[in-house]
Amino acid sequence: MKKCLIFALIFSIPLFIFGQSFNVGEKSLIYQDSSRNRPVKIEIWYPTYEIDSTFERITDLPFILNPTIRDATFIQKDFPLVLLSHGTGGNRFSLAWLAIALAKNGYIIAAPDHWGNTFDNKIPEYFVRYWERPLDISFLITKILADKSISQYVNKDKIGIVGFSFGGYTSLALAGANLECSLLKMNAKTPNGKKEFNIPELGDLTKLIEQISCDNVQKTFKDKRIKAFVALSPALGLGFNSTEQTKTIDSPVLIFGAENDNIAPIKTNAEFYCKLIHSSNFVLLEGKVGHYVFLNEASENLKKEAKKYYIDDNTVNRDTIHKKVEKEINLFFQKSFNK
């Protein structure tokens, strides 16, 4: 197990060092994974030259987001493709702030709803069916690359992923991190497990974890089409205990951890993953930064309704952190795709 070198979030990165800035188009699509009888609803953000002074709100939740142009024209060139995987009980808009920022810098972003694990479609057993999520992402890549209306604008040799929380695990699983199902079930019974698997979005998951039939779960989800991997406060570290589970990871990995994360504590998750993955770097968000800092900024009304997710400690500026995290991720993808 390697020593994890911890880097603080670099607040000295200039905000505009990455070249041309685009306007952002947006569209919604839905695919059907017939092999799993599973709908995969997605949102796509992409660079465009179109200009539109209107902003159509695309979600009922009052997030503070930069404007996008619905169904704008794509630019005739190929861009890197980045997949986003939301956290448990979130949805495809959970990381919209990051999607829009990356699209402005020349990426095509695709974010699915992980069916059964979204805020508006909560199916309890799907909150622990961890294998469905990487399968969603691999399915989505296949569909996008086969869809000529999108694939003609995608550089298939430059595909990356960013995941948050449960989505952070998803990103690492696609890199080649192989969760041990029986270990997860065993650790779910420990004090740490009972704490980590009692989540605000649904409550106690430990009984659902006990019901998983490990023999029927796919062992590895590595997708070689993805060349760079980012995990924001990744969860499910309790399913790992050995570098044998990560030995096939041969692509660059960037892991972010929040020092005050009490949902997926860094010692058993972000920092622990870093120790297991030889090709990873770890960026620590220091101070009173909590787990949900990676979610969108919310309006004042939503902050009142969902304080846990949208109100940070008064020493934490979510907008500032978002800007710096996006720049770190942008720089990471540029280095990874152009090495």
Identify the meaning behind each predicted range:
Residues 20-83:
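Domain-level recognition of soluble alpha/beta enzyme cores
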Residues 242-244, 251, 265-279:
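Short alpha-helix in the alpha/beta-hydrolase fold that links the catalytic acid
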Residues 236-238, 260-264, 291-292:
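Acidic catalytic loop of the alpha/beta-hydrolase fold
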Residues 126-157, 169, 173, 178, ...:
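Alpha/beta-hydrolase active-site loop
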Residues 276-306:
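Catalytic histidine neighborhood in serine/cysteine hydrolases
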Residues 299-339:
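Catalytic active-site module of serine/aspartate enzymes centered on a nucleophile-bearing elbow/loop
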Residues 66-122, 262-265:
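Short substrate-entry loop that stabilizes the transition state in hydrolases
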Residues 249, 255-257:
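Short beta-strand/loop motif that positions the catalytic acidic residue
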